[in-house]
Amino acid sequence: MSLLKYSFSLTPPAPPPAPVKHTYSFTEFLLELSEAWRQHPTDEENALHFVSAADQAAIVISADFYDIPEDKALGTAEVAVDSRLDAVRQSGEGALTVLHRAIKPHSSGGGLEMSFAAETEGGHVHLFLGYVTTRKVLNFTMICPPGKEKAVALFNATVPGFRPRLP
């Protein structure tokens, strides 16, 4: 009777390399983006633009600095969200459908968190996250090509890299 001997390697395969991230550190926020995103020049004061050719998407981050009394924060947030939605309406992309709109206290207690998701008649998806604190309004907007599910997936993959410094 012959005994056969077998050996198996149980060493798991090496994990895939972590995606390369670029870190942008500013006084008001920290931003980590995948290598697909490139900073795009802008003349806008207190604003940064990033473009991903692979995703055909854009990110605009802006900040407006002024003293905001606590009792005026909610009104300021309402105006900020409404003005951004109005700007999309006036962009010439057709009718706008607001899919989500919210203003709530930030979990840190450092201000209010604003958000909306909207889709234009032309199909572009606009996703917005912003903050109102006692000293600023900070805005993160992502504009994506048609396709809500893909846009939301890109936003959800990207926005954890946006870390505002509150207040």
Where are these regions (language model features)?
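N-terminal targeting sequences that direct proteins away from the cytosol to non-cytosolic compartments
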Residues: 1-74, 79-113, 119-125, 132-167
